């Protein structure tokens, strides 16, 4: 079952991206390097509730 998750920047706390993930294959929190428009660079984004 795929669910929508929000990704938040670890440095600014901005919630910049929405993506989907499969909870059965990825039960832990999702982490991705994504572009942060406020910092104008790539930063680590983590899944939020």
Swiss-Prot record:
What GO annotations for molecular function exist for this entry? structural constituent of ribosome
Q: Give a yes or no for keyword Cell cycle in this entry.
A: no
Pfam families this protein is in?
Answer: Ribosomal_L33
List the GO terms this entry assigns under cellular component, sorted alphabetically. Answer: cytoplasm; ribonucleoprotein complex; ribosome
Keyword terms: Ribonucleoprotein, Ribosomal protein
SUPFAM superfamilies, alphabetized:
Zn-binding ribosomal proteins
Q: What family classification does the UniProt entry report for this protein? A: Belongs to the bacterial ribosomal protein bL33 family.
Protein name as catalogued: Large ribosomal subunit protein bL33B
């Amino acid at each position: 079952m795929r669910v929508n998750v929000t990704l938040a920047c670890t440095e600014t706390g901005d919630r910049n991206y929405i993506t989907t993930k499969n909870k059965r294959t990825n039960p832990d929190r999702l982490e991705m390097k994504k572009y942060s428009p406020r910092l104008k660079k790539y930063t680590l984004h983590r899944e939020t509730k």
